[in-house]
Each structure stands twice: as C-alpha cells, then as structure tokens.
C-alpha cells in the first residue's frame, strides 16, 4: 500500500497523529495527556476563539511558562488559521510594549502573575495603548476584573464542554501550508528584537528534520 502524503499543515499533522497514535502525547506535572485529548480540547478551544471573533491571520500572544495550555492554544490557533506570537514569560514592560506594537496582537494568554509581575494590571492598561488588543485570557480560576475595555476571561471557561463541541469550523478558517503559524522574537542582543515568522510548512519541515536527526520514533 502506498504511503499517504505527509501533512502540510499543523492541523492536518495533528489529525493524522490522532488517527495513528493512541499513547501519551504530553506529560504536564502528574497528568498524562493523550493525542485524542489534545485534539478534542484544542478543537473546543478553536471554536471558542472563533466565537470571540478570532480567525485567520489574527495574532494570539502566549506569555506562559511550560504548561499544557500553551500547546492547546498553539493547536487551536493552527486550526483556525491564527498566528501564535510566543512571548517569553520573563519579558516585562519595555519588551512587551515593543512586541505588542510590532505584532498587533489581538488576544493574549497569560498568567495572572508570574515571578512578581502583575500581568492583569499590565495587560488591562496595555489595552489603552494598543487598540488591536481586544481579548485578555488568564490562566487562573478567577477572571480578571471588569474594566471599561472589557473583562478578562478565565481560560478554563474556554475549555469547558459545551453545546458547540461538535460544530465544524468554517472553511475560511482552514490554513494553507504557506500561511504564517508562529512568530518568535530574537534575543535583541545587538538591537531591538526582530520578529521571525514561521509557516505551517516550515514548522513541519523543522520537526521532521529534528526527528530524523535525533532518530526520534513514535514510541
């Protein structure tokens, strides 16, 4: 039997993986998460992000340490054609102001606080400086305070099962291989950080090259 062509978008790669592999995908502290759960949860989140008005080409910033919510958001963005802007959780006012202005982030996912930095205060104030920033999503059980620019959203509420869990995403969300998927910033050691854009095609090519180099297998 001829082998199937390699997936050319991250969403397609995830769908293929779900069909072929049923083991643990990620371990988050003491929680083992299978590929099927990653797919279902990211699809649910993708629908909720669409309901917020996010779609193809929109920038979604992620300011988180290593935790599973990062990956759920990454895959959800990939499914609706949005672009993830990865922001280091150690960045503070100066760096974040520059990157928010540069990348035109429309929604951002962050902890309420981290290492003594109050993200609720910073981000709610940032909405006045950056008109593109419409949605604040916080990884916490409590939503951010209601402010004139709009309330923050407790991220866990976007992951909760609901009546739209079987709804198909509209065709206009479907990403193409050369659509932008991810923006990361250089360290800026000799000047201001520079944005590096990564497409679906280049992200998958990089992953395959790394797997081949390290002799990584499905097990």
Regions found by a protein language model. Name each.
Residues 91-126, 206-219:
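Conserved ATP-dependent adenylate/AMP-binding module captured primarily in the ANL superfamily
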Residues 7, 22, 143, 151-153, ...:
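Conserved pre-ATP/AMP-binding loop-to-beta segment of ANL
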Residues 2, 6, 24-67, 71-75, ...:
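Conserved AMP-binding/adenylate-forming core of the ANL superfamily
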Residues 81:
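Structured binding elements
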Residues 60, 77, 180, 186-189:
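Conserved S/T- and glycine-rich ATP-binding loop of Class I adenylate-forming
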Residues 12-34, 139-146:
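AMP-dependent adenylate-forming
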Residues 114-177:
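ANL superfamily adenylate-forming
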């Amino acid at each position: 039997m001829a082998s199937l062509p390699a997936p050319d978008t991250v969403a397609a790669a995830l769908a293929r993986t779900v069909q072929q592999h049923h083991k643990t995908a990620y371990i988050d502290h003491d929680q083992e998460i299978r590929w099927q759960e990653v797919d279902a949860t990211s699809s649910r989140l993708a629908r909720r992000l669409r309901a917020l008005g996010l779609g193809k080409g929109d920038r979604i910033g992620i300011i988180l340490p290593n935790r599973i919510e990062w990956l759920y958001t990454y895959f959800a963005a990939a499914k609706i054609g949005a672009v993830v802007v990865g922001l280091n959780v150690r960045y503070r006012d100066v760096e974040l102001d520059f990157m928010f202005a540069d990348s035109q982030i429309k929604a951002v996912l962050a902890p309420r606080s981290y290492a003594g930095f109050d993200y609720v205060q910073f981000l709610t104030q940032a909405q006045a400086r950056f008109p593109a920033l419409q949605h604040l999503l916080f990884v916490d059980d409590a939503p951010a305070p209601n402010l004139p620019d709009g309330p923050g959203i407790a991220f866990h509420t976007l992951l909760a099962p609901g009546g739209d869990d079987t709804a198909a995403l509209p065709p206009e969300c479907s990403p193409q291989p050369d659509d932008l998927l991810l923006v990361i910033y250089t360290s800026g050691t000799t000047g201001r950080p520079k944005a590096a854009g990564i497409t679906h095609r280049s992200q998958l090519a990089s992953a395959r090259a790394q797997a081949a180099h390290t002799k990584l297998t499905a097990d």
